């Protein structure tokens, strides 16, 4: 839905299971529509659609895409952005650092991302804006060297040129949002600025790269880095980096009472990454 300042506010579906297109569509009907009824039943409702590679390939089928467009019209909902960070499974079985595979050194990541843009292009009306979010290049431990590999920068730059081609026929404002995240190739605002400086320097067409590649600023990720959001966003704008999208999430605030600590143990699980800071003696300084 649109806010008073005309910005789009969407409900993101990555919180629901959906490896296949059928699973994804079922979550739209069973969960997203219930959220819509509780939040904005009379307004045109926006969906931030998470599509893994399998679901994306299935939805790219001409008939399925047509049926999905009809469903969107009937339900008075729309998709203006796609979460393209998790390529494969994102629920149930351990994900952890595997969520970064394939990374931006591979053709698989670029092909998958462009597939999502192709789907989005079909869902948007002429002249509209749309985005896809993606990982921050790679996982730090996958690329232990100090320098960012040229192949990664070239893949992202090449993706920008392909997005430019996709956007042209319908005059769409399409852009890719790279998402800084703890343990990612770039995780802080300073590292993000450094990455984009290298990206602009290595690219064959800086103007197109600046137009088509930006940052998906996930507030919870940068909060884990103890960053001030106002300062971080101001820095990105100052350096001419496009703000592709903002991710907002909420968390419970609880005092460390015995009962609360017991309840929080439910969050000890093997599926997702948990950021922990240890001292030299091995003692936990902080765990996020």
Label the predicted regions.
Residues 1-127, 131, 161, 207-212, ...:
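N-terminal pre-domain/capping segments
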Residues 14-16, 50-54, 84-87, 135-139, ...:
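Active-site beta-loop-alpha junctions enriched in small/polar residues
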Residues 20, 56, 141, 255-257:
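Intrinsically disordered, low-complexity acidic/polar segments
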Residues 57-61, 143-147, 227:
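Short, solvent-exposed loop/turn segments at secondary-structure boundaries
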Residues 63-68, 130-137, 239, 271-274:
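A broadly tuned preference for mixed-charge, low-complexity surface segments
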Residues 93-214:
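Active-site acidic/histidine proton-transfer and metal-coordination neighborhood
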Residues 163-287:
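Acidic/histidine-rich catalytic cores of soluble enzymes
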């Amino acid at each position: 839905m649109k806010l008073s300042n005309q910005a789009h506010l969407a409900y993101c579906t990555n919180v629901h299971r959906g490896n296949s297109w059928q699973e994804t569509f079922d979550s739209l009907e069973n969960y997203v529509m219930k959220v819509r009824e509780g939040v904005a039943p009379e307004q045109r409702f926006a969906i931030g659609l998470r599509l893994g590679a399998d679901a994306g390939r299935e939805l790219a089928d001409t008939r399925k895409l047509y049926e999905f467009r009809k469903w969107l019209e009937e339900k008075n909902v729309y998709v203006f952005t796609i979460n393209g960070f998790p390529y494969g499974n994102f629920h149930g079985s351990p994900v952890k650092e595997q969520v970064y595979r394939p990374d931006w050194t591979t053709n698989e990541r670029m092909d998958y991302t462009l597939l999502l843009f192709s789907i989005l292009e079909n869902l948007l009306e002429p002249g509209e804006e749309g985005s896809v979010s993606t990982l921050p290049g790679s996982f730090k431990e996958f690329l232990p060297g100090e320098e960012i590999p040229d192949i990664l920068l070239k893949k992202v730059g090449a993706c920008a040129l392909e997005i430019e081609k996709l956007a042209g026929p319908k005059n769409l404002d399409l852009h890719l949002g790279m998402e800084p995240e703890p343990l990612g190739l770039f995780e802080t605002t300073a590292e993000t600025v450094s990455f984009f400086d290298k990206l602009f320097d290595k690219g064959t067409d800086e103007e197109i790269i600046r137009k088509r590649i930006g940052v998906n600023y996930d507030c919870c990720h940068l909060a884990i880095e103890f960053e001030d959001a106002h300062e971080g966003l101001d820095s990105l704008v100052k350096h001419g980096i496009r703000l592709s999208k903002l991710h907002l999430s909420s968390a419970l605030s609880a005092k460390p009472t015995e009962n609360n600590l017991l309840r929080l143990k439910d969050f000890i699980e093997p599926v997702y990454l948990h950021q922990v800071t240890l001292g030299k003696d091995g003692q936990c300084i902080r765990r996020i």
